[in-house]
From Swiss-Prot:
<keyword id="KW-0627">Porphyrin biosynthesis</keyword>
<dbReference type="InterPro" id="IPR038071">
    <property type="entry name" value="UROD/MetE-like_sf"/>
</dbReference>
<comment type="pathway">
    <text>Porphyrin-containing compound metabolism; protoporphyrin-IX biosynthesis; coproporphyrinogen-III from 5-aminolevulinate: step 4/4.</text>
</comment>
<protein>
    <recommendedName>
        <fullName>Uroporphyrinogen decarboxylase</fullName>
        <ecNumber>4.1.1.37</ecNumber>
    </recommendedName>
</protein>
<feature type="binding site">
    <location>
        <position position="317"/>
    </location>
    <ligand>
        <name>substrate</name>
    </ligand>
</feature>
<feature type="binding site">
    <location>
        <position position="203"/>
    </location>
    <ligand>
        <name>substrate</name>
    </ligand>
</feature>
<feature type="site" description="Transition state stabilizer">
    <location>
        <position position="77"/>
    </location>
</feature>
<dbReference type="GO" id="GO:0004853">
    <property type="term" value="F:uroporphyrinogen decarboxylase activity"/>
</dbReference>
<keyword id="KW-0210">Decarboxylase</keyword>
<comment type="function">
    <text>Catalyzes the decarboxylation of four acetate groups of uroporphyrinogen-III to yield coproporphyrinogen-III.</text>
</comment>
<comment type="similarity">
    <text>Belongs to the uroporphyrinogen decarboxylase family.</text>
</comment>
<dbReference type="InterPro" id="IPR000257">
    <property type="entry name" value="Uroporphyrinogen_deCOase"/>
</dbReference>
<dbReference type="GO" id="GO:0006782">
    <property type="term" value="P:protoporphyrinogen IX biosynthetic process"/>
</dbReference>
<dbReference type="Pfam" id="PF01208">
    <property type="entry name" value="URO-D"/>
</dbReference>
<keyword id="KW-0456">Lyase</keyword>
<feature type="binding site">
    <location>
        <position position="151"/>
    </location>
    <ligand>
        <name>substrate</name>
    </ligand>
</feature>
<dbReference type="GO" id="GO:0005829">
    <property type="term" value="C:cytosol"/>
</dbReference>
Amino acid sequence: MESNKPAIVRIIKQNKPNEKVPIWLMRQAGRSLPEYRKAVEKTSNFMEICYSIDLVVELTLQPIKRFDMDAAIIFSDILIIADVLGCDVNFVRGVGPIIKPVKSSEELKNSQEFETKTFPILNAIRKVRSQLSEEKSLIGFAGGPWTVASYIIEGGSSKTFSKVLHFCSLELEEVIKKITEATIIYLIKQIEFGADVIQLFDSNAGILQGELFERYVIKPTKEIVSAIKNKFPDFPIIGFPRSAGNLYKDYYEKTGVSAVSIDYNVPIEWAKANLKIPLQGNLNPSLLAYNKAEAIEEAKRIIDCFRGLPFIFNLGHGVLPDTPVENIAALVDLVRNY
């Protein structure tokens, strides 16, 4: 019965509001928590953490234990797909991901070995789901193919994305095709191992406009959504095409996602008027980190705007590492009681 499902699953599947607005935060498990810093202090690199079953379970559950969030999101990274496809992914403290740049789709390995490589993550999903109470959702995720492609072609993050934008379009389509196929396999496995909801993080979607947005963001996302829903009809899938602006409307209408997470640059009144779909968002993480009083006022404004609509409270991007835990606690308390 749907009434027994977690609030976030119900909101998305029924397209109806919940009596209480549920809350979880992107990057809720991470460097803002002292228990996270203690748990990872003896690890040598970030990818080691991502492939450690016990650490992933512990880190995923930390914000549930501390803040009683309505959802846990599996502790992982969007570049797991790149790593499994044979890209040499390393994380450098203070810099971010460093990857040997891919110059051809032929450099990407076949995705047949996927389950073996990702088994620690999938096993962690199963363990978290068994330890999570029934009323809480477990969110699995992957990066949007365009975003993953832009990282592996650039060799990491970029301010200009000049390499990927100059990349041969036929070759780029082949890279995105391989990433899309691998993402489908990975997300279906996450669902089979216990994820209740999937989120697609297309963090670099805002770089593209018009026909390029259609080709590299909408098309692969639609393929992923169709493949998942072909196997799991009505499965809740949240899309997050960050910084897509008014293309959020095209995105949700054409991809078939079940809900959309909006970034903090999207005016909430515009979202309410134009995005007729369950919404998630969109408090600015900088406000939460550096101005608690202003963050609380803005959170009230967001809740008031979406009152009576299918809505999940979140940030417009991930929690910043130096966000005080008391600010997060105050936000959760506000959303619970407002």
